[in-house]
């Protein structure tokens, strides 16, 4: 009985040991993240990587202001539609905006050869200047042909500003030949057309010659054209058609034209220079007084986030497009609430069972209990290293996704609808690959982050254990019971790593011997009890066997024969 009393007394005294615990911060955040191995892991803090807001306006970029074509299409500007006179004197732009409505483009019905390539060429330049190429006053033809299909802003018959409709003069249309040399230091884009009358009578009426031949040649092209005469459906009041062509005349090159009818001859060309973003947007957004690094068809996006889910088509340095509406990067700790019913030191588990809501000055820290009371303090060094690491992780994700990739919205004609379909599929597949890479990267980083936080707490725990050495007992739950009296100054030295274990070595050794002695007494007591129990059990069993044997003999059920 004395042994049990001594054991109880010493164990009770052990609960009075000064104690220091290692743990981490927890808060009331409801944020969760996904990792490679877990879904919806609670964390104290996250960074949303997908930007969703947008300002519905048009802004300039570092290359300048956009060219907003309110009433004209790009084709109308290039051909010189008479209702696009506003753009005759040349323009400069960073990108082009067309409105999603019927625009003034090709006024006399017909089609432009390689139209999408012409649009792409013009959208990629920065500015143009109109240059005179041919002077038709020297030609023995009429060069003032007009059409009601190409009315000007006064609703009077007119024609393209970049070309001349050549017709007979004095009842004749002799063969006309002329040439132009590009003496400028930039390319010149020029256009021409071939007229296809609806009837032979109109052919003769306009050009005298029933069978004509026109040619346009340079060192790179050699084109000859004959009209296809015949009636066609009425479009813009016309049964005739025009096929439109274009070419690029490089510096030093010469273009030669020859015709005896049906040629819509080039008069002005466009001297093109510089490079723009090479994009054509189509929207009704208003123009703002602003400059942006990221312009989408839907508006302006100003953000430092690496991803957006608004549009895959953009201009400038925009976040990568991913279909996902949210992608969260963990930049805090695993958010495990403290066990509430155990009190501050009832069984603090630190990094094992839960965090501390009272740890507000850092991510990792200490709680202690001694004769002076209890206290909590953050470990600023490990916290700062972790915060710096989180910022590096965020920058790492941004850098890995910073390789600019633009999905260019190629424009193909109806004839090339299959190419358009293939292009769209390729765009979608590339976008899916980017989205998969982004999600996988974030899952990996989240996994590493949570693992690193666990390691940081363990490292802090190991640091304290190395400082205390044999002067404390590791209770296995993130806490240490100190085998000597440790006031607040002593606790500070443990936290900052200046603790001198030799100063308390003797006191701790004596206390540890007491603890070990109690354990020995306890073990001896248990051994004696075990022996007593075994002997008593054996005696009882032996008595039961003997009693059964005697009972059997008395009843005649057992017969004993002794042989000598």
Swiss-Prot record:
Segments on the Extracellular side according to the record's topology features: 17-530
Molecular functions per Gene Ontology: host cell surface receptor binding
Gene Ontology biological process: clathrin-dependent endocytosis of virus by host cell; fusion of virus membrane with host endosome membrane; fusion of virus membrane with host plasma membrane; viral budding from plasma membrane; virion attachment to host cell
Covalent lipidation (S-palmitoyl cysteine), chain numbering: 553, 560, 563
GO cellular component, one term: host cell plasma membrane
Alphabetical list of Pfam families matching this protein: Hemagglutinin
S-S bonds: 21-479, 59-290, 72-84, 107-150, 294-318, 486-490
InterPro entries for this protein: Capsid_hemagglutn, Hemagglutn_HA1_a/b_dom_sf, Hemagglutn_influenz_A, Hemagglutn_influenz_A/B
Parts of the chain that traverse the membrane: 531-551
Localisation per UniProt entry: Virion membrane; Host apical cell membrane
Membrane topology field: Single-pass type I membrane protein
Segments in the Cytoplasmic topological domain: 552-564
Marked site (Cleavage) residue numbers: 342-343
Classification via Gene3D superfamilies: 3.90.20.10, 3.90.209.20
UniProt keyword NADP, yes or no: no
The record's account of how the chain is modified after translation: Palmitoylated.
Superkingdom assignment: Viruses
Annotated glycosylation sites: 27-28, 140, 151-152, 222, 302, 309, 496, 523
Main subcellular location of this protein, as a coarse class: virion
Keywords: Clathrin- and caveolin-independent endocytosis of virus by host, Clathrin-mediated endocytosis of virus by host, Disulfide bond, Fusion of virus membrane with host endosomal membrane, Fusion of virus membrane with host membrane, Glycoprotein, Hemagglutinin, Host cell membrane, Host membrane, Host-virus interaction, Lipoprotein, Membrane, Palmitate, Signal, Transmembrane, Transmembrane helix, Viral attachment to host cell, Viral envelope protein, Viral penetration into host cytoplasm, Virion, Virus endocytosis by host, Virus entry into host cell
Signal peptide from the UniProt entry: 1-16
Function: Binds to sialic acid-containing receptors on the cell surface, bringing about the attachment of the virus particle to the cell. This attachment induces virion internalization of about two third of the virus particles through clathrin-dependent endocytosis and about one third through a clathrin- and caveolin-independent pathway. Plays a major role in the determination of host range restriction and virulence. Class I viral fusion protein.
Quaternary state and interactors: Homotrimer of disulfide-linked HA1-HA2.
Family: Belongs to the influenza viruses hemagglutinin family.
Miscellaneous section: Major glycoprotein, comprises over 80% of the envelope proteins present in virus particle.
Name this polypeptide is given: Hemagglutinin
Native organism: Influenza A virus (strain A/Duck/Alberta/60/1976 H12N5)
Lineage, uppermost ranks: Viruses, Riboviria, Orthornavirae, Negarnaviricota, Polyploviricotina
């Amino acid at each position: 009985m004395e042994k049990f009393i001594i054991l109880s007394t010493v164990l009770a005294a052990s609960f009075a040991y000064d104690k220091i615990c290692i743990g981490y911060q927890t808060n009331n955040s409801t944020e969760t993240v996904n990792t490679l191995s877990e879904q919806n892991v609670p964390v104290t803090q996250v960074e949303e990587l997908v930007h969703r807001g947008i300002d519905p306006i048009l802004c300039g970029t570092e290359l300048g202001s956009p060219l907003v074509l309110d009433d004209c299409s790009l084709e109308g500007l290039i051909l010189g539609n008479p209702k696009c006179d506003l753009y005759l004197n040349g323009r400069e732009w960073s990108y082009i905006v067309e409105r999603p409505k019927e625009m003034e483009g090709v006024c006399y019905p017909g089609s432009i050869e390689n139209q999408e390539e012409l649009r792409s060429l013009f959208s990629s330049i920065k500015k143009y200047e109109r240059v005179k190429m041919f002077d038709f006053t020297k030609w023995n033809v009429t060069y003032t042909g007009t059409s009601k299909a190409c009315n000007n802003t006064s609703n009077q018959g007119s024609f393209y500003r970049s070309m001349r409709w050549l017709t007979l003069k004095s009842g004749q249309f002799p063969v006309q030949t002329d040439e132009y040399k590009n003496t400028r230091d930039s390319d010149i884009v020029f256009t021409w057309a071939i007229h296809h009358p609806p009837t032979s009578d109109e052919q003769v009426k306009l050009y005298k010659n029933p069978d004509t031949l026109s040619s346009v040649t340079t060192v790179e092209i050699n084109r000859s054209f004959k009209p296809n005469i015949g009636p066609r459906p009425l479009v813009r009041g016309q049964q005739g058609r025009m096929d439109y062509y274009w070419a690029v005349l490089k510096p030093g090159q010469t273009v030669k034209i020859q015709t005896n009818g049906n040629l819509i001859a080039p008069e002005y060309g466009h001297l093109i220079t510089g490079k723009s973003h090479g994009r054509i947007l189509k929207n009704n957004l208003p123009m703002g007084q602003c400059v942006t690094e990221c312009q989408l068809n839907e508006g302006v996006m100003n953000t430092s986030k690496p991803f957006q889910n608004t549009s895959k088509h953009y201009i400038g340095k925009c976040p990568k497009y991913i279909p996902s509406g949210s992608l969260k990067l963990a930049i805090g700790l695993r958010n495990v609430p403290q066990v509430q019913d155990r009190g501050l030191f009832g069984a603090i588990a630190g990094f094992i069972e839960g965090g501390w809501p009272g740890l507000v000055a850092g991510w990792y820290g200490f709680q202690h209990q001694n004769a002076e009371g209890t206290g909590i303090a953050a470990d600023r060094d490990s916290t700062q290293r972790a915060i710096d690491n989180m910022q590096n992780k965020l920058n790492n994700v941004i850098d890995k996704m910073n390789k600019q990739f633009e999905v260019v919205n190629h424009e193909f004609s109806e004839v090339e609808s299959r190419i358009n379909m293939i292009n769209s599929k390729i765009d979608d597949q590339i976008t899916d690959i980017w989205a998969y890479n982004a999600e996988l990267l974030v899952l990996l980083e989240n996994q590493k982050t949570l693992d690193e936080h666990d390691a940081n707490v363990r490292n802090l725990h190991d640091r304290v254990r190395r400082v205390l050495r044999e002067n404390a007992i590791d209770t296995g739950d993130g806490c240490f019971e100190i085998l000597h009296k440790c006031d607040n100054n002593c606790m500070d030295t443990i936290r900052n790593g200046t603790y001198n274990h030799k100063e308390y070595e003797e006191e701790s050794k004596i206390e540890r011997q007491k603890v070990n002695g109690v354990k020995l007494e306890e073990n001896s007591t248990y051994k004696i009890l075990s022996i007593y129990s075994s002997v008593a059990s054996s005696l009882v069993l032996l008595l039961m066997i003997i009693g059964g044997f005697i009972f059997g003999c008395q009843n005649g059920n057992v017969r004993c024969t002794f042989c000598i």
